[in-house]
Amino acid sequence: MKVLFVASNRIGDAMLASGVLAELARRHPQARFTVACGAAAAPLFEAMPQRARTIVLKKGKFKLHWFALWLRTVANFWDIAVDMRGSGLVWFLAANRRARLASRDETIHRVEDAARVLGFAPPPAPVLWLSDAAKRAAAKLLGDGPVLALGATANWSGKIWPPENFLALAEALTAPGAVLAGARIAVFGGPGEQAAAAPLLAGIGARAIDLVGTVDLATAAAAIARADLFVGNDSGLMHVAAASGVPTLGLFGPSDERNFRPWGANAAFVRTAESKDALFARIDYQPGGSHSLLTSIAVETVEAAARELLRRARREAA
């Protein structure tokens, strides 16, 4: 049995739809899967047990990447062809069953939206597949003892909580007698985000574990999964953290938590008092701008939410 699954180019979107892929695999244990996605998201699928291959999409002019993908898939007969990108590709392939994300429902979470494509109910939670090699690499990086993971970057500055706030939070959560007393602090981010994380890393000093663009995504994901708590901006790594099962606290302002809050029993979020629309309405928003829209979120608010989340997770694990 052959299944084609076209996933997102983006880490976060690919992660949020991973539960649909995992549920397909659970329902069809004999199937072999071809996953098509962008280079950034491809490592998320490397350790999927039933994956036969990954086709990495390279965006081309005039959407020619879709024609290139069609050329690489048209010779196969697919038992199931699923397109989470919403293109028309599946209609030009030989398949027993075709499904595509035709439109977004902006009133529900992206996990629920993804589940609609194949009618899965309840919506399957995102799944993080980790290889033994990635786990070993993460163990070597983090070692033993408690770890606080911080996702202090994002794809634009408006979604980034100020680094001085992350530093104050880390100091409060790891102080003597605190919920993560003495924990080391791992800071995560992607390639090209080093400048955004530099002030935080400098403030943490010797206790910092710098994982901002220093390791591949699979290793970063495995390292996040080893942490005791993840606190981060709305980003792909936040969704990776939630899928791993680590207690995950997301920080929201100019993105909608109805669609993008971290998904799972061990997840929570804090957002600005102002809505996404209100934040955009009161500023002269320019893509790529250099100002944070999360400055109104107090350190004390995030600290309290983090402590409550961690206590709840520990209570449920006991």
PLM segments and residue spans:
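Catalytic machinery of carbohydrate-active enzymes
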Residues: 1-318
